[in-house]
Amino acid sequence: MAAQRGMPSSAVRVLEEALGMGLTAAGDARDTADAVAAEGAYYLEQVTITEASEDDYEYEEIPDDNFSIPEGEEDLAKAIQMAQEQATDTEILERKTVLPSKHAVPEVIEDFLCNFLIKMGMTRTLDCFQSEWYELIQKGVTELRTVGNVPDVYTQIMLLENENKNLKKDLKHYKQAADKAREDLLKIQKERDFHRMHHKRIVQEKNKLINDLKGLKLHYASYEPTIRVLHEKHHTLLKEKMLTSLERDKVVGQISGLQETLKKLQRGHSYHGPQIKVDHSREKENAPEGPTQKGLREAREQNKCKTKMKGNTKDSEFPIDMQPNPNLNVSKESLSPAKFDYKLKNIFRLHELPVSCVSMQPHKDILVSCGEDRLWKVLGLPKCNVLLTGFGHTDWLSDCCFHPSGDKLATSSGDTTVKLWDLCKGDCILTFEGHSRAVWSCTWHSCGNFVASSSLDKTSKIWDVNSERCRCTLYGHTDSVNSIEFFPFSNTLLTSSADKTLSIWDARTGICEQSLYGHMHSINDAIFDPRGHMIASCDACGVTKLWDFRKLLPIVSIDIGPSPGNEVNFDSSGRVLAQASGNGVIHLLDLKSGEIHKLMGHENEAHTVVFSHDGEILFSGGSDGTVRTWS
């Protein structure tokens, strides 16, 4: 009897308690056998060996047909091999396909006690136990065998411990899985809340966009009648333009016919003899044209009568043809070189607020300055002594322009009005009201009967001085119209706008004839050269462009930025272009050589610049309320 390894003290105490209470058989025999096999215990078994008799051995008979030795191989080794193979085949055939079930025999009580005593080293107790145990067996007391099997407590404990460990591992895994699931749940809840909030925000934005869309639809619907009226007006104006062009062609033909008739009449008066023949020949030649000319004359008279009855009898008439431009007689290249060596000569503080405009009287050495202090002043040159001060506007002045005769002055203001002043008396003789926002610029027509103005309300207006009303409103710009000017001695207008375009208009019809594109920023000013061949414009980033007015194409672009160009002006020869810049510098551009000269003298922004009639003196106004003279 022997034991493989020792037992723990706790197991011994459990065993002693079980023996003291009387052991009873319990547990499943198969589970106990598995536990004992896992423990590796040894068993004590009594075996009686009897001597076997060879006479009682039963030999297996092998049939001759199943055991035969081939010819030529009748030796002992072959015979033994054949016999073994035959026996193996028979055993395989007789073997059952179903494996026998495993039967575990539990450890008997006496073997268990003996193993326990040996492990504990209790040899004397073991001797006493064995003596008494075998003595009882010899006496025939066999009731002890019927007690039954004692369950293997140690094996059960080990199994329970293993199961407990496995359960703890499973519990740990489940806790980890639960923690991970909790984290995932929190993350999913946060994402759910985020997406819910995002969804609510999107729903609110969608509802807002829907409301805005509805408002825009209503807004656009309110514009449809206006657009329809404008389209009708546009078509009407186009028809009127076509009729006007046809009538103009007819009038030109009539004038040419009259001129030829006058020439023939003059020839007839100079030669009295053949006067009758000439008259008869003229009558024969003009016989087909006579009724036509007569009909045209009658139609014109009827149209004039209808116009007088239908319109305002005080309305002025635009000149039919372009008037001769006296500046065209000036030589293209002046014999004297252009002047660029201007130096600051005098500084006159005339206004308390920035100077917005200075302008020269057309025929005399008189200068007018306008300021944001709501005043305009007439200055006598060259000392710039104040001759007259005018006031009447309720807001800052933006621009001024002399009547072609020089006896009247037009001023534009931030109070949305244009006023006409009598320079002899210094009184306001007329006020034009119609713009909805500040008026930026004004200009006189060469005939002196019309004043044009441009405004922050994206429109320009043409005012009739005689009828004292607005004759036409020019629509087309999409932003503030910053400047306006009449082409010299014609009915053509030039406007510059914050929508980065220049527009050319027919003042008689109010139709935009052409738009010029090229500036990338708001255009602050645009002006014709004295001969009317070029246009100069400057924008809010200091870029100055020259345009060919005859071809309506850009000539050159000059970047003098980044300070804005506030105003541009030509000298009387048209060779020098001056630009007043936002950094206080006056730039002089030589149009012949392309050189740029700078005049430094303004401490702050330079708002306006103008040349004297002879080009020897330059006047500039700045944001400090001063007018400076350069010579």
Swiss-Prot record:
GO terms for biological process: axoneme assembly; cerebrospinal fluid circulation; cilium assembly; mucociliary clearance; sperm axoneme assembly. Isoform 1 is detected in testis. Isoform 4 is detected in testis and brain, and at lower levels in kidney, heart, pancreas, thyroid, ovary, adrenal gland, spinal cord, trachea and liver. Pfam families: WD40 (PF00400). It comes from the Eukaryota. Residues 266-332 are annotated as: Disordered. It is found in: Cytoplasm; Cytoplasm, Cytoskeleton, Flagellum axoneme; Cytoplasm, Cytoskeleton, Cilium axoneme; Cell projection, Cilium, Flagellum. Phosphorylated by TSSK2. WD repeats lie at residues 350-389, 392-431, 434-473, 476-515, 518-557, 560-600, 601-630. Necessary for sperm flagellar function. Plays a role in motile ciliogenesis. May help to recruit STK36 to the cilium or apical surface of the cell to initiate subsequent steps of construction of the central pair apparatus of motile cilia. This is Sperm-associated antigen 16 protein. It comes from Homo sapiens. The gene is SPAG16.
